[in-house]
Amino acid sequence: MLIKRRAFLKLTAAGATLSAFGGLGVDLAPAKAQAATMALKTVDAKQTTSVCCYCSVGCGLIVHTDKKTNRAINVEGDPDHPINEGSLCAKGASTWQLAENERRPANPLYRAPGSDQWEEKSWDWMLDTIAERVAKTREATFVTKNAKGQVVNRCDGIASVGSAAMDNEECWIYQAWLRSLGLFYIEHQARIUHSATVAALAESYGRGAMTNHWIDLKNSDVILMMGSNPAENHPISFKWVMRAKDKGATLIHVDPRYTRTSTKCDLYAPLRSGSDIAFLNGMTKYILEKELYFKDYVVNYTNASFIVGEGFAFEEGLFAGYNKETRKYDKSKWGFERDENGNPKRDETLKHPRCVFQIMKKHYERYDLDKISAICGTPKELILKVYDAYCATGKPDKAGTIMYAMGWTQHTVGVQNIRAMSINQLLLGNIGVAGGGVNALRGEANVQGSTDHGLLMHIYPGYLGTARASIPTYEEYTKKFTPVSKDPQSANWWSNFPKYSASYIKSMWPDADLNEAYGYLPKGEDGKDYSWLTLFDDMFQGKIKGFFAWGQNPACSGANSNKTREALTKLDWMVNVNIFDNETGSFWRGPDMDPKKIKTEVFFLPCAVAIEKEGSISNSGRWMQWRYVGPEPRKNAIPDGDLIVELAKRVQKLLAKTPGKLAAPVTKLKTDYWVNDHGHFDPHKIAKLINGFALKDFKVGDVEYKAGQQIATFGHLQADGSTTSGCWIYTGSYTEKGNMAARRDKTQTDMQAKIGLYPGWTWAWPVNRRIIYNRASVDLNGKPYAPEKAVVEWNAAEKKWVGDVPDGPWPPQADKEKGKRAFIMKPEGYAYLYGPGREDGPLPEYYEPMECPVIEHPFSKTLHNPTALHFATEEKAVCDPRYPFICSTYRVTEHWQTGLMTRNTPWLLEAEPQMFCEMSEELATLRGIKNGDKVILESVRGKLWAKAIITKRIKPFAIQGQQVHMVGIPWHYGWSFPKNGGDAANILTPSVGDPNTGIPETKAFMVNVTKA
């Protein structure tokens, strides 16, 4: 047998390693034999490439599958992949065991109302029965007109959550099917992890995505890691952090705990969880006072010069326009003064007393070091060191980046946490540049893609706003969401909204005209929230009858888990689609549950793991990467895409036979676009639909399209309904040239190679642009501010941009006739320092978490975010002596999310077998707790046990003259498995949320800790 190079290297490496250990006197003969056998097995195996299914770094995998058994025999890192270069974290390295796992249910499971056990059922019985339940509940709860007489065509009785664990193509048909049924309660992981990111970055820059990409971290001069712990939670990203350090970059970590990330940093500063805005606003004050801002950038690329209207005011933590009864702002008070053409008035000297720059100087003057230190618990000298180091990147040839995650997002001020740093990055000129950006570390393999494809109640794919009751016609819908600008230098890219919305609607109902098809879309009630916390509150109140939990475990993942679990008992039926049984599917047999009293009918559908199916996922850096089938789905598991297709076809058949209320959206849904000639899910056909194709012949400029031809770029989409595009930002991903996401070409120009763009490896949205807002990396004539790491440059002789795909094809801004401004997704073309579109203020303001250890703070008399989402029936602990300690949740390297997949993977479970609570030595002494003791953590909402870990890595904080203790717990556990592993951390967390997105505040709440 010929041994290929890769197998030969494996054999020799294994032999060398085992020889070394053999020299220690250890008998390694069995291990040698096993290693040799495994290496030889992979030589003749089918080899496919895939992408890791855990965090959103997007590491490449090579999967070896036995050709005879069609089972995986080995999964390893792909050495050719430019992100991970063959390396994997513990979770990625365990992928083989995830697939080849005896704990995966072999067949669908059914739990009858009142039953205390599962029973196996056939797939046909399950799918037919679920389809019947869907059709029956839809008919019973379908609202054609609301109380005002407005046509809404909405199904109020069914909700669905999930899933960032699905491929893009599965996500798209999933949302299409749900919306055809009339669902508005559509939510998934993004709401409770990074919804704050989208709202903050879209307000600041125009798009809600990570601005740069993982490899680009190596180009940074200073990396600030705050609200994140990348060394443990995104380990392969840290490869690129260390590349930057090797080149001389300064690494900074600001975090409540001293972690593995901290150990590699030049500066570590402790900070009380929930006090980030004070720290970041202090940095803004420092930049402004010391004049460390990049003035040309601030004047030319931001709205610093915009003059704010006379209605703006701010006093004691409240902006103008606040209504105490409704707890909302009249945001018109925050608007800009405008000229006769409707364009904002500007003062480029930045001297006008009401220009944004001057308003900012006034707003931030309160944030002095003494107050910041007193509320954050961070020593003043460390605050100054962080500010000095990071603000040095305000020079044209320097770049600083921020890496953040749940530590910023999961707060009632989550959006403003991110806005605060977004503002600092603009002041320092760090947006659009190599080594800069605001980089959101997403924690689900495809949470970027699932959000792009509209798996949330408020957006359709491509971030198109959803329809509401007050928008009865398609014409009014496009008018509402299409901004108008008369500024000739503003690209105002969202003016193309009608092209994108028409193409989306036509992807679902190509045979209906736009007005008719728009009528099929469900219309939410104006002013009503349908997001995660409200969804489960409505379920708790018995308003929701049927529920899909698709690739998600809300009984553990949502805030106030006891409330969520109780809400599930109020359902008529629930469908749980997952790889393993879990706390959601089996809620009826969980703690404090009496199955006999629970009437919820439960259907558990076992699905395929990532390496068992084909399709694309999009990582945090917006790279859309194609995965191929390795092993077949284990036993009788079925891929999500096929499940969606089967359910959609069955419901269509039922409604075709007995139409009931408005059957047309379901029966006319073009499911033919989803399947191959055999009627099975076809990821390639759906990827082509997402890209978009011509429905009839037409011409754009010199480009002619024939009906059925793939659209090359979203600039060619049409507003008249002659094109499809399931998600306009993905147009260009699957063209007549083929599947761009499947590309593996590492060729680069010298300019691209300097910063590691890899434009031929897979495809990035939009239009394969790797660093968004990149025209802000050059001066007004198109010359790079940092020539040694240029992203784009204007070639005046050839009249074109070189380097990355420019963020807009126009000439530089100095060309007053043809040039356009850099931030094309904002109406005026400028990035927003001052953002009047958010619910809680145009500038970040400090507020305490809804549960906190203080009754006042030094910045204003307003303690909490006055617009935060909360429920009047739920108690909160503010300076409550029963709950004296701050608690925060976090992750460990070996587990992922609620632990549903990793707790069922023996290698990983062995490393982190049960719930623990980290606490300081001082707190342990105070409570008489020793290392390894069992302790009880209790909040207003519930209690759980954990094993105590006493550590020097957590220290008490000095907060306003008093000592405040903090404890930390991982959120990966649940009662169902393993036995004695502990329960969900979210039993303790509050159902309160950010007013912009409803993301829950699970990173700062109050508990008591006692020895069990």
From Swiss-Prot:
Molecular function GO terms recorded: 4 iron, 4 sulfur cluster binding; electron transfer activity; formate dehydrogenase (cytochrome-c-553) activity; formate dehydrogenase (NAD+) activity; molybdenum ion binding; molybdopterin cofactor binding
Chief subcellular location: periplasm
Cofactor: [4Fe-4S] cluster; W-bis(molybdopterin guanine dinucleotide)
Location(s), subcellular: Periplasm
GO cellular component, one term: periplasmic space
Reported function: Alpha chain of the formate dehydrogenase (FDH) catalyze the reversible two-electron oxidation of formate to carbon dioxide. FDH loses activity in the presence of air, but this activity can be restored. The alpha subunit of formate dehydrogenase forms the active site.
Protein name listed in UniProt: Formate dehydrogenase subunit alpha
The species this protein was found in: Megalodesulfovibrio gigas
The organism's taxonomic lineage, starting at the top: Bacteria, Pseudomonadati, Thermodesulfobacteriota, Desulfovibrionia, Desulfovibrionales
